[in-house]
């Protein structure tokens, strides 16, 4: 065994892995990050970055930020033209008024109420998942703070929260609006990275989850360069192009194996998905835990790619109605890429939903949806679940990744999880990494 004085080895140089690594390093730990990719990911991070991360890691917000587009979304209208929604609530209402005066009149109130509900989730997301069986004073105080936050928002917000979280996004939007294009834009946020249709229960929660960190009236996650920024900050060593497996003996993680080399560490932190993390550790795990991890719903449904685009930075949403989204899901439900896929395009990048696999004609169908020729679209091979598990009501908070193990620790002593497969899930950049680091520092 190679003697290496690492206090921690972090597997994965994504936003969560790097956030965990830098928190540990700032606490005086010697940290090695191991990542199988040869080059850093040049893509922007999609999702809210809690301000605590920027402040506590002393990140320059000017270099880690990305200019957000305005309008924040555009969608083609059936009769020609586009519906554009802006960061200014009143300006969006003016745009909506051209297609539905009734919807325009409700827009401001809808935005205000959704922002309040997303604020409740934000309060939950910057802490480890609540332990509902706890008797520890610190945990009880955290639960009390969240409850007080909700109470201060008023009776209507508490009613909205209890009523809306289990609803389908279609039910929520049908309560408020009549225009199909508007409901298609908003409904798409409710099924983002879910192999479910807009009429599935709990998709209203997914809608609010992706509203976290965004201003009122903006229902897509913000962008940042968090991963790129952390990768260049001093304090941790990053080894790229290196695939590692976790080494555990006697129920304790002792390091990782890279090729023929074994690197020792006091603890190991994995930002990989739970199934991958535990794949080689099953003989040391309880059968019930192995079963629970194997049953995590990780139904990949998104393919990414590129198109030549039109030079616009304004994201284009092709989801003309809730029915369109539901029919697109119907294909995926039976394992087929959608005949009419839900597509979002921003700059040169495209996001194709309900396409866990890429068939010969998918690129052409995506091109048709975008109104371009098929030679202008290139799709990447499907590559697993970006969120490391569906964000459904049975896989959030203290049930993520599995019930009983929501606090980033695992049955293997000295092995922790910090990826989006843990609370609060994907689409919240770095939050799981920060929460995991705080638990690790408290326990070790």
Segments (PLM) and residue ranges:
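A conserved FAD-binding loop/helix module that cradles the flavin
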Residues: 420-441
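A glycine-rich dinucleotide-binding beta-alpha-beta segment and adjacent secondary-structure elements
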Residues: 179, 183-193, 321-329, 367-423
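Structural core of flavin- and non-heme-iron oxidoreductases
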Residues: 1-32, 36-39, 96-98, 102, ...
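Helix-rich C-terminal "cap"/substrate-channel and partner-interaction subdomain
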Residues: 109-141, 276, 284, 336-399
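Mid-domain catalytic core of redox enzymes
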Residues: 213-219, 236, 242-347
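A short, glycine/Asx- and small/polar-enriched loop/turn
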Residues: 79, 195-201, 247-254, 348
């Amino acid at each position: 065994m190679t003697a290496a004085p690492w206090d921690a080895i972090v597997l994965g140089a994504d936003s969560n892995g790097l956030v965990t690594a830098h928190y540990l390093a700032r606490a005086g730990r010697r940290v090695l990050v191991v990542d199988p990719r040869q080059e850093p990911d040049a893509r922007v991070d999609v999702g809210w970055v809690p301000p605590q991360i920027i402040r506590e890691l002393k990140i320059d917000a000017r270099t880690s930020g990305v200019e957000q587009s305005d309008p924040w979304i555009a969608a083609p209208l059936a009769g020609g033209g586009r519906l554009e929604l802006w960061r200014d609530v009143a300006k969006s209402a003016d745009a909506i008024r051209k297609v539905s005066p009734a919807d325009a009149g409700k827009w401001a109130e809808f935005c205000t109420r959704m922002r309040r509900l997303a604020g409740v989730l934000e309060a939950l997301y910057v802490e480890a998942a609540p332990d509902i069986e706890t008797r520890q004073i610190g945990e009880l105080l955290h639960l009390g703070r969240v409850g007080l936050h909700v109470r201060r928002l008023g009776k209507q917000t508490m009613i909205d929260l209890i009523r809306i979280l289990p609803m389908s996004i279609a039910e929520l939007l049908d309560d408020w609006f009549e225009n199909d294009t508007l409901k298609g834009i908003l409904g798409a946020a409710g099924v983002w990275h879910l192999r479910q249709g807009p009429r599935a229960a709990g998709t209203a929660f997914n809608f609010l989850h992706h509203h976290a960190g965004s201003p009122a009236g903006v229902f897509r996650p913000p962008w940042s360069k968090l991963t790129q920024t952390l990768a260049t900050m001093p304090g941790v060593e990053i080894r790229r192009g290196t695939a590692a497996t976790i080494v555990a003996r006697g129920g304790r993680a002792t390091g990782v194996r890279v090729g023929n080399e074994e690197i020792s560490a006091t603890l190991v932190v994995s930002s990989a998905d739970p199934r991958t993390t535990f794949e080689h550790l099953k003989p040391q795990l309880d059968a019930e835990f192995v079963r629970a991890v194997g049953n995590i719903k990780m139904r990949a449904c998104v393919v990414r790619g590129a198109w030549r685009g039109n030079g616009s930075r304004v994201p284009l949403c092709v989801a003309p109605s809730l029915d369109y989204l539901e029919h697109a899901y119907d294909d995926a439900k039976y394992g087929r890429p959608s005949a009419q896929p839900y597509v979002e395009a921003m700059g040169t990048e495209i996001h194709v939903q309900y396409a866990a696999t890429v068939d010969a004609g998918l690129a052409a169908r995506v091109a048709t949806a975008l109104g371009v020729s098929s030679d202008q679209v290139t799709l990447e091979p499907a590559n697993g679940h970006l969120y490391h598990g569906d964000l459904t009501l049975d896989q959030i908070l203290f049930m993520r990744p599995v019930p009983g193990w929501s606090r980033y620790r695992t049955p293997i002593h000295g092995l922790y999880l910090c990826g989006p497969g843990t609370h609060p899930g994907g689409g919240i950049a770095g939050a799981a990494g920060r929460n995991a680091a705080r638990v690790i520092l408290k326990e070790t």
